[in-house]
């Protein structure tokens, strides 16, 4: 009987990925503009800032310890519940599903700053124009690139597919998108008692926090 790790991975849906990426990048930016308006009107409460700090810290752990050290580099081993928790926290950062993220980062290390590196700033041509293009590509442009994605996932994802915890968390990525915004909203609503205060908490603990994670 053929195991999961021996099966070919599903073909990437590039259109869906680009749509999700565009939403994931643009909505937090809109959230920051809303937050600036709220801050101008002094509509920021301790619970909003607490949610911002706590969720920024937790998702940072999910990306650095989970997505990067554990799933990309296999730097340590841990239990299935901890693998699931780290993968979910990383998903809360809205940087993509755990399998795709780990595959692209493995590819980055395999082709660091040469042709094939998915987000190198040094392969976009010479001169000032090349540097500007490279800066944009390395910061955000590569999110929308489909060059070599299917090949990198075919090469780098077999051990990830072999882990049922990782597969399930990756498959439920849209749920984590809802929860990364829904949990701050629910806490803000529970503390403040109104939908508006729940919305404020979602802006600070969700959208602003995601924006900071993407750009800082």
Q: Which sequence ranges carry the predicted segments?
A:
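Non-catalytic, topology-defining segments of multipass membrane proteins
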Residues: 1-215
